[in-house]
Amino acid sequence: MESSAGPMELVAALLRGLTPRAEQLLQLSSGGGEAAAGGAAEARAAVATVAAALLGCAFLVLWRRVSAGRKRKREEAERSAAAVAGVGKGGKNASAAAGEEAGGADGRKRVTVFFGTQTGTAEGFAKALAEEAKSRYDKAIFKVVDLDEYAMEDEEYEERLKKEKISLFFVATYGDGEPTDNAARFYKWFTEGNERGVWLNDFQYAIFGLGNRQYEHFNKVAKVVDELLVEQGGKRLVPVGLGDDDQCIEDDFNAWKETLWPELDQLLRDENDVSTGTTYTAAIPEYRVEFVKPDEAAHLERNFSLANGYAVHDAQHPCRANVAVRRELHTPASDRSCTHLEFDIAGTGLTYETGDHVGVYTENCLEVVEEAERLLGYSPEAFFTIHADKEDGTPLGGGSLAPPFPSPITVRNALARYADLLNSPKKSALVALATYASDSTEADRLRFLASPAGKDEYAQWVVASQRSLLEVMAEFPSAKPPLGVFFAAVAPRLQPRYYSISSSPSMAPTRIHVTCALVHEKTPAGRVHKGVCSTWIKNAIPSEETKDCSWAPVFVRQSNFKLPADPSVPVIMIGPGTGLAPFRGFLQERLSQKQSGAELGRSVFFFGCRNSKMDFIYEDELNTFLEEGALSELVLAFSREGPTKEYVQHKMSQKASEIWDMISQGGYIYVCGDAKGMARDVHRVLHTIVQEQGSLDSSKAESFVKSLQTEGRYLRDVW
């Protein structure tokens, strides 16, 4: 069978067919009279035809690349799910299994394990539970499924869920009570479908949530999904697990898991099965690592320099962007640092909207990487390849391993780009280290810290003291795991850092601006902690200084933190410190709107910092926005200048009447900054303003504020 012609072949054929005729037409048009006019017209038509063909083929290429990317991502998810479910070659894939009713022809009950993850923890728990469940229930099939990959189109969610009988959900809450990126589409579909009624009569489920109790909307996503599942007919097997990452979320997961087993026993064991089962011991995950000679690897090493060929850029397919500008925003009098950085995205295909976030992948600094090399005992220049399968193609770890990073790669580059070395290690990492500790005393100590008996000591010595992975490894120098174990079980994958974009494409279409405060603080254990990304940003070399500039893999994450569609609507912005970032973009956008003739509504910006002479960032720009009319009023709070500390929430109280008037006129309220302190205080003050200025009791004031959030008029970009 002949292969079909590709888009470029079609264009080539079209050009070949038109070229001879085009030459004739050009000859005719160079003459005079009607023949020349007719020739010119036909020549223009020919050119238009070619242009249309080229444009059509360009769209076709783009569509194919996007479709191929989605298909590839779907196939990867299916392979992973099939591996965990025990489906081998010739078996049904995950999507086919997802559509089957429980208790198919093979008589095996099926359990679907969904996850929505931002950093990989929820996915790790989902896969760990599925692996353990396989050992407990040999007559059941467990499928692990990415919520985003479960359905390619929104309408498929309901169709597929109707066929599920037993499902487990691992969902994290991110940001201001929001779902993770890969759960966002499902969450939006599920929470906005208010007309479904009761339709999950045969659906049994359990949910484990991942959150942080320090944040206002602790495990909101898990709680909302649970509430809606019950309303729509689902039967809850066990209470929602509320994992708290502020303490030890692994302990929370294990405790919840123990409540789940008795319920699954009732559903998945035969009546005649009276076995209690053996104690399950999880295998230590390990990638297959092969060291290769430098001359064999040099021409094969893949890196992000080739990453700009993707049709769509996301966390899995970032875009290489050079640093164009870097400058310090604090004055020399300040003992802290804040950097203004600009990524050059010209020609990359990357675009953004005002209010979006940029994800930045950076590297561990050299001194940290060198310490890791010393502790592991590997040569920094050694090349290796890393694989999630055996040499025969069989998945390792039952398919529970995350896809490895690109290789061949040197030990130094792998540690710099992909290993999270500075966060505190999880208990599972301590178990892995204990397995490879040659000193039995060290091994016993590591196992104790990871055990239920060592819970309090782990909480104090590791979590409360903020000991990093490298600090813990330094305390147990005999623990030298192989690279395959280190990257699979000890060091989590280094995650991108997200920043509110501090520019508007109306003013900077080919630049993404970032405003970043340097993280440089002493931990309780005495170590000076340097933020991975903020340190890189502070030391970045811009292209305005040298052609050999710094660069990073970046991508844009869309946000709902947007200005009102109608520029005449009043706007209240609250953002101390680097919380100013998105509002700088807002004000650039409003200035552009004004310059285009739009009538702007009143806008007030509450900004706070320590001292006007030290950390009043973008002061000149803010004054320009005032002068040009993009900003109506700038309200300043300096916490270290007067005899008493003043913060933005205090200034809000002083402007209570004005704020209420703007809200009453349909105004929007935006808050950006620290979620644990400032955003909570601002929320309380807003509640008080609504209650007092609106003459409402406390419960009605709370309902009013919630209605502002529901209507999208009270938005927060907090961390």
Curated annotation (Swiss-Prot):
Cellular component aspect of the GO annotation: cytosol; endoplasmic reticulum membrane
Residues annotated as binding FAD: R497, Y498, Y499, S500, T515, C516, A517, G531, V532, C533, S534, W719
Membrane-related topology note: Single-pass membrane protein
Sequence ranges on the Cytoplasmic membrane side: 64-719
Domain of life: Eukaryota
Group of enzyme by EC: oxidoreductase
UniProt GO MF annotations: flavin adenine dinucleotide binding; FMN binding; NADP binding; NADPH-hemoprotein reductase activity
Reaction catalyzed: 2 oxidized [cytochrome P450] + NADPH = 2 reduced [cytochrome P450] + NADP(+) + H(+)
Cofactor or coenzyme needed: FAD; FMN
One Pfam family this sequence matches: NAD_binding_1
Induction annotation: Induced by methyl viologen, acifluorfen and cadmium.
EC number: 1.6.2.4
Subcellular location: Endoplasmic reticulum membrane
Domain Flavodoxin-like: 111-261
Lumenal side: 1-42
Residues of the FAD-binding FR-type domain: 316-564
Function: This enzyme is required for electron transfer from NADP to cytochrome P450 in microsomes. It can also provide electron transfer to heme oxygenase and cytochrome B5. Can reduce cytochrome c in vitro.
Family that this chain belongs to: Belongs to the NADPH--cytochrome P450 reductase family.
Name of the protein this chain belongs to: NADPH--cytochrome P450 reductase 2
